[in-house]
Amino acid sequence: DRNLIASMKRNAILINVARGAVCDEEALVEAVAQKRIGGIGVDVYTSEPLAADHPYMRIAGLPNVCLTPHMAWGAYEARVRCVNEMVANIRAFCAGERRNRVD
């Protein structure tokens, strides 16, 4: 959402590895290009593969922009790690513990 992006700190780095549509891609491009946020790291897009006229292509060469293809999920090791993390999270929850907190 454009308003949320506008409220970010100037040194904030937005990472989107969820879904491309979660973020307003055009607003992110504007915020990075105008140096209103520190940068972005993205491996999910509203349309894949990225077309030459996709908004991210305007900022792709900037040092504070990291655009990667969304391929990590396919690896066997990634699926094993996901299951292991899920089990650890469930065990921690059942024990009343907190994991992976960002405060």
Q: Where in this protein do the model-derived segments appear?
A:
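Rossmann-like dinucleotide-binding domain for NAD(H)/NADP(H)
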Residues: 2, 11-13, 17-103
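Short alpha-helical donor nucleotide-sugar binding micro-motif in glycosyltransferases
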Residues: 5
